[in-house]
C-alpha cells in the first residue's frame, strides 16, 4: 500500500516512546501509521449466516481475510472498488454487512467473552452504530439495548444504521452519559463505554487527526472519561460486565482511567484479563490484563480495551434534577393486540414475546419487553420500532418494521431481479414480467426483505422511504 503523510506533533512522539512496550519497534509504529487502513466488514448475522454470506459473494471475487477476534468480521480487498463503492452494493443496502474498522470490533468481543449472555445492555456512546448493531447481533435481537448518543446530529445516523440492519431490540436516548449512574442505578447487565477520546489511533484513516493534539487536551479528556466511567459503573448491576474502550493510545486516557476507578471503588472493581480473547491477544496485553493495541501489532487502527466486573453495590449517586414527563404510549392488549398481530402476520411480519405492542394515537409500536422497566426513569428519543399507522381500511405498515420482522419465505414474498431491485432502491415502481398474485407484496432480493408494497394492476407501487432513495451507480452497474 502507498504511504501517506501523517502529522505527528513532537510531544506526541515523545509520549508514544514512553508508552510503547520495549517489545515493540517504534520505527514499525511510525511505518504502520503511514500506511492506509485496511478495509473491513462485519457480516450481520441477524440476516444471514457467515457461510451463506461467503457463498453469496463468492462470484464477485472479493478477497476476505478473517479478523481473529470477530468470527463474522473480515478484512476485504476488491478489484471493483473504484467501479462500485462498498456502500452501494446490494448486500450493504439490505443490511447483510456493516462497514466497520477491525479494531472497533474488539470491545463487543470483550463484552461477550467467557460465554457472557446479558439481557439488558447499554451502549453509552453509540453513534454511528457499529457496536450497537454488533451487540444486537450477539444478542440475537433479544433482550434490550439502550443506545445513547450525546451528539444530536449523530442520533439520526445511529437510527438509520439500526434500521438498515433490521434491529428491533433497541431504545435510543440523547443524553450526556454522566446522567445514567444517577438516573438508572444498577439497571444493566452489561455496559459498553466506547469513550470520546483524543483519537490518536485513527491517523491511518485521517492523517490530520493530531493537528489539534496537545498533552493538556489529553488530561482534559481523561477527566471527562473518568466521570463517564463512574456513571457507567453506577448504572451497572452487581455481577455485571463493563467494557471501557477508546481509539487513542496514551496511557492517561486508557490505563490511568481504569486504574482510577479501581482506586476509587477498590474491591468493587475486578479487572477481567483479555489475554485469551483471541489467538495472539497476549501481544497487546498490558500488566493489568487490558489490550493496548498499537497499529503495527495487528495492522489495524490503534485501540484500547479494558473489561471489568462490578463485585458489589455502591452508594447511590444524587438523584437527577430533571423531570421525565408523561409517557405518551399505552400498552395494547387483548382483542386489539390480537387484531394487530393477525393483520401483521398476514403480510409476513412476525415477532415473539420479546416485543410488546404499544399505541400512541393511531401509531402502533413494538417495544422490547426488557426495556419497559426503564419507562418513567429516562426520556427516550426513540423506543423500539414503529410497526404501523392505523387508518379506516386497516394498517399502513412501516418500512423499519418490514426490514426487522418480515419473513422472506412468506406466501406474499415476491423476489425481484437485480435490475428490479436497483429500480426499487431508486424509488421507482416495478413492472415485473409476471406480476404477483397478492395485492400486498413483500418485496425481496437475495431472499432479503426490501419493503412492503401494493400491487396496482401489473405494477408494484414503490414504498421505499424517500429519504433512503439512492442515485448514481448501484450494483448492476447502471446509472
Swiss-Prot record:
Molecular-function GO term, any one: RNA binding
UniProt keyword Ion transport present: no
Pfam family, one: Methyltranf_PUA
Catalytic activity: cytidine(1407) in 16S rRNA + S-adenosyl-L-methionine = 5-methylcytidine(1407) in 16S rRNA + S-adenosyl-L-homocysteine + H(+)
Primary subcellular site in the record, as a coarse category: cytoplasm
Keyword Cytoplasm: yes
Compartments in which it is found: Cytoplasm
Coiled coil residues, start to end: none
GO cellular component: cytoplasm
Sequence positions that bind S-adenosyl-L-methionine: 125-131, 149, 176, 194
One biological process term in Gene Ontology: rRNA base methylation
Catalytic-site annotation from UniProt: 247 (nucleophile)
Keywords on record: Cytoplasm, Methyltransferase, RNA-binding, rRNA processing, S-adenosyl-L-methionine, Transferase
Enzyme Commission code(s) on record: 2.1.1.178
NCBIfam families (UniProt xref): nop2p, PRK11933.1
UniProt cross-references to PANTHER family, sorted A to Z: 28S RRNA (CYTOSINE(4447)-C(5))-METHYLTRANSFERASE-RELATED (PTHR22807:SF30), NOP2 YEAST -RELATED NOL1/NOP2/FMU SUN DOMAIN-CONTAINING (PTHR22807)
Role according to the record: Specifically methylates the cytosine at position 1407 (m5C1407) of 16S rRNA.
Family per record: Belongs to the class I-like SAM-binding methyltransferase superfamily. RsmB/NOP family.
UniProt-recorded name of the protein: Ribosomal RNA small subunit methyltransferase F
The species this protein was found in: Salmonella paratyphi B (strain ATCC BAA-1250 / SPB7)
Amino acid at each position: 500500500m502507498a504511504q501517506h503523510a501523517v502529522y505527528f506533533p513532537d510531544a506526541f512522539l515523545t509520549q508514544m516512546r514512553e508508552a510503547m512496550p520495549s517489545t515493540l519497534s517504534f520505527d514499525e509504529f511510525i511505518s504502520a501509521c503511514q500506511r492506509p487502513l485496511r478495509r473491513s466488514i462485519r457480516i450481520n448475522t441477524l440476516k444471514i449466516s457467515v457461510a451463506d454470506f461467503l457463498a453469496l459473494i463468492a462470484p464477485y471475487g472479493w478477497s476476505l481475510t478473517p479478523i481473529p477476534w470477530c468470527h463474522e468480521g473480515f478484512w476485504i480487498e476488491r478489484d471493483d472498488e473504484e467501479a462500485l463503492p462498498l456502500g452501494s452494493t446490494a448486500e450493504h443496502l439490505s443490511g447483510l454487512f456493516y462497514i466497520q474498522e477491525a479494531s472497533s470490533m474488539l470491545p463487543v468481543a470483550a463484552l461477550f467473552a467467557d460465554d457472557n449472555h446479558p439481557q439488558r445492555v447499554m451502549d453509552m456512546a453509540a453513534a454511528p452504530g457499529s457496536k450497537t448493531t454488533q451487540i444486537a447481533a450477539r444478542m440475537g435481537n433479544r433482550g434490550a439495548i439502550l443506545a445513547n448518543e450525546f451528539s444530536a446530529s449523530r442520533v439520526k445516523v445511529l437510527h438509520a444504521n439500526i434500521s438498515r440492519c433490521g434491529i428491533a431490540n433497541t431504545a435510543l436516548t440523547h443524553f450526556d452519559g454522566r446522567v445514567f449512574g444517577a438516573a438508572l442505578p444498577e439497571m444493566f447487565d452489561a455496559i459498553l463505554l466506547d469513550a470520546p477520546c483524543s483519537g490518536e489511533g485513527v491517523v491511518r484513516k485521517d492523517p490530520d487527526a493530531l493537528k489539534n493534539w496537545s498533552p493538556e487536551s489529553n488530561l482534559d479528556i481523561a477527566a471527562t472519561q473518568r466521570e463517564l466511567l463512574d456513571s457507567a459503573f453506577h448504572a451497572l448491576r452487581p455481577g455485571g460486565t463493563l467494557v471501557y474502550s477508546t481509539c487513542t493510545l496514551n496511557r492517561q486516557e486508557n490505563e490511568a482511567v481504569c486504574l482510577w476507578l479501581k482506586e476509587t471503588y477498590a474491591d468493587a472493581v475486578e479487572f477481567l484479563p483479555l489475554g485469551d480473547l483471541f489467538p495472539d491477544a497476549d501481544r497487546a496485553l498490558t500488566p493489568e490484563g487490558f489490550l493496548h493495541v498499537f497499529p503495527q501489532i495487528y495492522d489495524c487502527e490503534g485501540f484500547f480495551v479494558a473489561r471489568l466486573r462490578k463485585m458489589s453495590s455502591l452508594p447511590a449517586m444524587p438523584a437527577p434534577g430533571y423531570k421525565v414527563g408523561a409517557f405518551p404510549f399505552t400498552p395494547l392488549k387483548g382483542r386489539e393486540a390480537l387484531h394487530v398481530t393477525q393483520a401483521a402476520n398476514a403480510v409476513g411480519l412476525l415477532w415473539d414475546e420479546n416485543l410488546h405492542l404499544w399505541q400512541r394515537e393511531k401509531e402502533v409500536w413494538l417495544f422490547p419487553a426488557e426495556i419497559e422497566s426503564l419507562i418513567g426513569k429516562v426520556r427516550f428519543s426513540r423506543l423500539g420500532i414503529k410497526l404501523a399507522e392505523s387508518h379506516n381500511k386497516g394498517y399502513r405498515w412501516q418500512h423499519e418494521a418490514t426490514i426487522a420482522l418480515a419473513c422472506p419465505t412468506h406466501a406474499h414474498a415476491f423476489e425481484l431481479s437485480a435490475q428490479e431491485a436497483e429500480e426499487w432502491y431508486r424509488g421507482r415502481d416495478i413492472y415485473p414480467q409476471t406480476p404477483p398474485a397478492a395485492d400486498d407484496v413483500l418485496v425481496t432480493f437475495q431472499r432479503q426483505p426490501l419493503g412492503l408494497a401494493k400491487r396496482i394492476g401489473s405494477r408494484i407501487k414503490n414504498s421505499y422511504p424517500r429519504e433512503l432513495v439512492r442515485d448514481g451507480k448501484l450494483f448492476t452497474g447502471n446509472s
